[in-house]
Every structure is written in C-alpha cells, then in structure tokens.
Amino acid sequence: MAKISDLSDELLVKILSFLPTKEAVSTSCLSKQWEFLWMWLSKLEFYFSDGSESACLRDFIAKNLPLHKAPIIESLRFCSFFGSLQPKDLKSWVRIAVSRCVRELSISLHDTTAAVSLPSSLYTCKSLVTLKLYGKKVLLDVPRTVFLPSLKTLQLERLRYSDEDSLRLLLSYCPVLEDLSIVREDYDNLRALVVIVPSLQRLSLEIPGNCSSDGYVIVTPSLKYFKVVDYRESMSYLIEQMPELEEADIVVLQYPEKLLESVTFFKRLSIRVIFNTYTETVYRDGIVFNRLENLKLCICNGDWSKLLIQFLKDSPNLRVLNLLVDDYPSSLGDYEPVRWKNNKSSVPKCLLESLETFEFAGYIGTPEERDFLSYIFKHARCLKSSSILSRPERYHGI
C-alpha cells in the first residue's frame, strides 16, 4: 500500500487546498517534505482576534507572505476582530498580494484602532476579479489613478467613503463589472448614491432607515437582477430603464411606485411592503408588468387586498402567484377592503388566461381571506396547482 509520503508534492498541495489555512500550515511540522508545502497554496485566509495569538499570527504573516511560492494568489482573506490587525500591516500585505496577481481579495474589519485605507496599488491591480470589503474601519479612499480591468464582483458593506466622489470614481473605472453589492450605514459619508455601470448584470442595495434621503441615480442598461432593501421613510430614485431585467427583489417601507415605475421589464418579482400609518396601500395607476410571470408578494399590513388586486390587474401574463400576508394592525382606520364577491365585472386577465400556480401563506381564515380564495378558485381557469398554508402565530388583533 502506497504511503502518503510517496505522493508528489503537487498532489499533496492539492490535498492541503481542501483544509483551512491554519490547519494546512500546521502540517509543516510533520516532516521535512511537508515543511514548506503550504507555501504553494493559492488560497489563504487569516482570522485575527484579540490577544497574543493575533500577535503571533501577524509575525507569521509578515515573515512568510513575502516568501510565498504560489505564482498567483487565487484568493486572500483577512478578517479582524477587536482591533487586533494594524493598518500598516494590512497595507503591506495587500501590496504583496497585488504583486502576486491576486484574483480575489476579501477584507473584513469588525474593529480596529484606526480606519484603514488600502494601498493605491490595489486600485490598478490588473488581475483582481473579486473585491469584498466589510466594516466601518475600512476607508474607501480611491486615488485619481484607478483602473481595474478584470474586476467582475464588488461587495462594499458597512464601510466608510473618503468623500462623495469615491464610489463614483471607482465604478467609473471597472469596465467589466458584473456584480455589485452595497450595504450602507449612516456613518459612511455618502449622501447621494450614483451607480452608472453599463456592464453591470446584478445589483444589490441595502439602505437602513437612518441613511440620507438624497437622490439615488442608477444607470445599468445590462442589469438582469436587481435587489433593493430600503427602510427609509422618504426616498428618491432616478432609474433609467432596464430592458434586460429578469428578476427584481424589493423590500420597502412605503411608496413602491418609486421603484416599480422604473423596473417594469422583469419576469420574476419578489416584493415585501411594510406600510406605515400615512401611506395608501397601492402604487399609482398606469404601471403595467407585461413580462411578469412569477410574483412573490409579502404584505406586512392588515390592508393587504388593495395592493394585491392592483398587482393582479396590472400583470396580464402572470403564471405563478405566491402570497404571504403577515399583517400588523390595520394602519388605515377607514380602510375599505376589496369586495371580492362584488368584483365580477373586472376579473384580472391573468386569472382568466394564464395563472397556473397559486400559494397563499399566512392564512388564518378571516372573511376577507375566504372571499378572496373563493374568487381565485372561481375565476382562475388555467390553475394547475394550489396550496394554502396557515400560520397560527400570525398577528390579527390579539
């Protein structure tokens, strides 16, 4: 039987690549053959926590990363907790990674003694395909000389921007960027947000309620997937048409028309609406979703039926409807629910001609819900499958 020591170094490095970096490094004490094998690994990850262990790890990286033997670093990740990673160390290691043609770089700073700006060489790295930056101590300070010709995936979550122009400048020089994710915080130094990326195919935005309400400009003509989670009570969007859009995932407190009127081309829509006490529970007339085939609608309000009937009327080719009602107490005291029994003269076209799959989750058997189900089953002529899921814990006035 062959011994593991008889295997080639190339195969042993392949085996080590399936281990976390810490475990892979620990094999260096097995024998002379194993001593430096880990230094050929192309994927490295280092986690810092408080205490002497982090100091040892810093010394280890400072000594060994400059001597790393892999000609290309496929993936490099640094994650720091409790101020254990020093800014000057991180800058030095990123420079080394750039010199080794790093393809994916992930930096997560949950807490450090000072904000860390990344070296200017990172912003002209020709090999970089994926960049992920997390944490309020990461400072995005983009130099005037910036060009990332290979960058396709960019994630910017809860970090700081040196000024209003940093994000716009960075995006302007990523000619093949396809996937962009931005999670904002109130401390990030941005007021407006401008995303003008002709090549972008996926865009995800998360905006907490305490962020600024200045204008958001989105120009992404190649976009196929759009996700926005916006908890602000006031919002302003300027969105150019997205003719290639296939899917949208929207979570808003109110005013869904601010987004819906600009993204009507999708085939699949998932939307969660949480209305407040001052909002009418519909969007404006004139918005039609001719391409919409799959709708997942979650309404966190007792006044759910008015929005639902409008979606049904404005989606003439709808094939799949997933409805989740997770209501709070009715926010509109004079709200008049849809009278499903008396709504015979204007049956939505999708019920008569296209709806095939229907699911209702959160059902508790109110008179309005029973009338709605009777309406669906009476008029949905093409229906092939349906399911009604109860949710006992759902709030309904108790």
From Swiss-Prot:
PANTHER family, alphabetized:
F-BOX/RNI SUPERFAMILY PROTEIN-RELATED, FBD DOMAIN-CONTAINING PROTEIN
Q: Tell me what this protein is called.
A: Putative FBD-associated F-box protein At5g56700
Residue ranges annotated for the FBD domain, each copy included: 340-388
Pfam families, per the entry: F-box, FBD, LRR_At5g56370
Q: Which species is this UniProt entry from? A: Arabidopsis thaliana (Mouse-ear cress)
Could you tell me which residue ranges the F-box domain spans? 1-47
Cysteine pairs bridged by disulfides in the record: none
InterPro entries given in the database record: F-box-like_dom_sf (IPR036047), F-box_AtFBL13-like (IPR053781), F-box_dom (IPR001810), FBD (IPR006566), FBL13/AtMIF1-like (IPR050232), LRR_dom_sf (IPR032675), LRR_FXL15/At3g58940/PEG3-like (IPR055411)
Name the SMART domains on file: FBOX
